[in-house]
Amino acid sequence: MATAGGSRRAPVPGPRLGLPLAAHLPASLGGEGAKDSLGGEKTSGNNDWFQSSRVPSFAQMLKKNLPVQSSAQTVTLPTGYSSESCSLSNMASKVTQVTGNFPEPLLSKGLSSISNPVLPPKKIPKEFIMKYRRGEINPVSALHQFAQMQRVQLDLKETVTTGNVMGPYFAFCAVVDGIQYKTGLGQNKKESRSNAAKLALDELLQLDEPEPRALEPAGPPPIPAEPIVTPEAAYISKVQYEGRQVQYAKISQLVKETFSQLISSHSQYLKCSSSLAAFIIERGGHHEVVAIGTGEYNYSQCIKPNGRVLHDTHAVVTARRSLLRYFYRQLLLFYSKNPAMMEKSIFCTEPASNLLTLKQNINLYLYMNQLPKGSAQIKSQLRLNPHSISAFEANEELSLHVAVEGKIYLTVYCSADGVNRVNSMSSSDKLTRWEVLGVQGALLSHFIQPVYISSILVGDGNCNDTRGLEIAINQRVDDALTSKLPMFYLVNRPHISLVPTAYPLQINLDHKSLSLNWAQGDNSLEIVDGLSGKITESSPFKSGLSMASRLCKAAMLSRFNLLAKEAKTDDLLEARTYHAAKCLSGPYQEAKALLKAYLQQHGYGSWIVKSPCIEQFSM
C-alpha cells in the first residue's frame, strides 16, 4: 500500500488524475450548488470557531480529549447517540423527486463532515482506537467518526503527485480543521483515500508517537516528501493479492462441498444451485459455512398480516435471514452463562458498551454464485464509456429497484397497487443497505453492535468483472454519511472479488420458483415456494400445519422473545407487536432514516416501504 509524507500546511492543488464521472455528464446531472449528504449547502473550508484566538486550539483540545496512553482507567462511551438537528419532516421537505435531473453527480464526490461550533468535543473512546488498530473500522470511516466526535470539519481532497513518483498513481490528502495532513498515494482513488485517512489518523491519534514530542522552534516549513515506490513493495502487494485469491478460491470450494452434502439426498434440487448465496464465518484463519440460501422470486399475492408468509426468497436475502437464525443460536450460547458454551459463541462483551460484539479475528464473508439483481448488473458500457451515456440511462441504471415476481422495475414506477402487493427492494439495494446498517437487522440490534460483511465473493460463471457491484455497494453512498450515523454505525467498504464459481449456471425450469434455506445447526434443508411464501409439501423440513417458513417474521419474533428472556431484558418483552419491537431499536431506526433520506436526496429514488399492517402481529 503506497503512502507518502508531505507538508501538513501546504496548499491543496487541484485534481490531476481520474476526473470524476460528473465531468463528463450533462450539466443537468450535476446541479448548480454543491450539497452535503443531507441536502444542505457545504460549509466553507475554515472553521471560524476553532480559529478564534479566544478558544483552545484544535491541537490543545485533541490532546485533552485523547485517552491517556499510560492510564489504566476506563473511558466510557457517550451515553447518547448523536443525531442531526433536523426532524424527519424537515428531511422530507428537502427531498428531490427522481425526474432524471440529479441534485448531485451519481458517483458522489467526497463530502465534508460538518463541524458543530456549539457542542463541545467528545472524548475519544479507547474502544474506538482499539477497533481501528485491529482493522475493524476502515480508515476513511474511522476518520469521519473522529471528526464527528471532535466537532471539526473534514475534507478528503484530491491532490497531485510530484514528478519523482512514476506510474499512474492517484493522490489524496486529509484536511482536518483547516490543517492538511500527509498525502496518500494509490493505484485507484479508493486506495489513495484510504491511505490518506490512515496517515491523518495515525498522526491525530498519536499512534506512531508513544511519547509526546517537545515543541519545535519556529522555522521554514518542511520540504514535502513523496514515497519511493520500490519494486519490492510492488512484489509484496502482488504476493498479498495472489494469496488472497487462493484463500477466496478455497472458500468457493467450501461452499460447494457444503451445499452438495445438503442436497445429497435431494438431487432433484441441484439446479437451484445457480442462484446460490452463502455466508461464511472466518475464525482464527478457519472458515465455515454458516448460512445458505437460493431463490429468484418473491411473494406477489395479497397482504397477510400474520407474519407467517415469506415475502422475499431471492438467494442473498434468504441466506441473510438464515444468517440471523445462526446469530440467534450464537447469542443463546453466550447468554447460557455456561463458560464452555460461551467460549464457542462468536460474540463477546465490550468494555463501556451494553451491546455485544464479534470476537476479535472473526470476519464475515458473503459468496454469491451470480450477481444480485438490480444496480449490480449495470451495463458495462455505462461504466466504461461515461462520455456516451445519457442522464436518463444513468438514472435508470443506478436508481433503486423493486422486485416483482422475479423481475426488476424502477421504484419510481411502483404504483400504490404495487405497494399493496408486497413488493420487495432488489437484492443490490438491500446489499447497499446492509453496508450501512449491518446485516443483523432491527431486532438483533437490541443485543449486538452492527455486523458488517468483510468480503463479497462473486462466482465467475456469468460475470466478467465486479465493477457494477462496486458502484452499487461502494459508490452510491459516500463515506461522509458515517459522521451523521449513530455510534457503532458506519459506511462499510467490503472487499469485492471474482472467484471460481461453485456451480455452473443452469436454466431451472422445473423448480424456478423454489427457494432453499439452511443455517448451521439445522438437520435438513427447508424448501419454500417463493410465489406463495410457504413451505412446499416436498420440503425435508416442515414447521407444522401452517406451513410457515422458519425464516418468516413470526418465527423471528419468537426467537427474539426467547433471547430477551435469556438475556433478562424484560423491557423488550413489553413490545406488543413485531413492529413495536423493531421501533424500540432507536439507533438502528435513526441510521435507517438517514440512509433513506440520503438515497432520495441524491437522486436514487425512494425506498419502497411495505404496508404497516404486515408487521402489526404478535405472538
Curated annotation (Swiss-Prot):
Q: Does the keyword RNA-binding apply?
A: yes
State the similarity comment. Belongs to the ADAD family.
Give the taxonomic lineage as stored in the record: Eukaryota, Metazoa, Chordata, Craniata, Vertebrata
Q: Which PANTHER family match?
A: ADENOSINE DEAMINASE DOMAIN-CONTAINING PROTEIN 1, EUKARYOTE SPECIFIC DSRNA BINDING PROTEIN
Q: Pfam families annotated for this entry?
A: A_deamin, dsrm
Superkingdom? Eukaryota
Primary location recorded for the protein, binned into one broad class: nucleus
- A GO molecular function for this record? tRNA-specific adenosine deaminase activity
Where's it found, cell-wise? Nucleus
Q: What is the protein name for this chain?
A: Adenosine deaminase domain-containing protein 1
Q: Which UniProt keywords apply?
A: Developmental protein, Differentiation, Nucleus, RNA-binding, Spermatogenesis
Q: What role is this protein assigned? A: Required for male fertility and normal male germ cell differentiation. Plays a role in spermatogenesis. Binds to RNA but not to DNA.
Where does this protein come from, organism-wise?
A: Rattus norvegicus (Rat)
GO annotation, cellular component aspect: cytoplasm; male germ cell nucleus; nucleolus
The DRBM domain covers 138-206
SMART domains, alphabetized: ADEAMc, DSRM
Enumerate the spans annotated as A to I editase domain: 291-617
The Gene Ontology biological process terms listed for this entry are:
adenosine to inosine editing; RNA processing; spermatid development
Q: Where is this region: Disordered?
A: 28-47
Claim: RNA-binding is one of the keywords in the record: yes
